[in-house]
Amino acid sequence: MNREEALHVLEHSEEIVSAQEVSASIEAMAKAIGAQVSEDFPLVLSVMGGAAVFTGMLLPHLDFPLEFDYIHLTRYRNTTKGGDKMEWRVAPAEAVKDRVVLVLDDILDEGETMAAIRDRIMAMGATKFLSAVLCEKTIEKSKPLRPDFCGFEVPDRYVFGCGMDAKGYWRNLPTIRALTDGA
């Protein structure tokens, strides 16, 4: 992992969503979320580390009382392909019991990670589970769940920026980019 490799990744990518489109989509998503859960005093859980940027952009637009925490479940480990093994680094707190829980994540690829989160949270006694993702990847196979709120559908390519990384790089970009050949 080095600066040259990071620049190589960026050079072999293309912008698919602009920073302005990201901002507008997040504002619209916040309104939709508020319409559904503003009276529920939801527990909002951010999935680290990918959802950090998305969460930071979304939370200021949620203009209702909520409680916030984070969880960390990973499958990727700085690669561009998800692994079969999921690793809980920070599990949900007991505060999910008898709560409406909204989970924020950067992207829903195959849906396996979000399904595992949903199953764990519901088993812990949440009354309702909702998910919001910045992106959902369009893929051929069926998914165990779809997000309740989604900013963008993206093609079945490796995407990064706005919290999503490419080989550990570029979570900090304000745009969403897709790798091209040669990355």
Where does each model-flagged region fall?
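PRPP-associated nucleotide enzymes
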Residues: 1-183
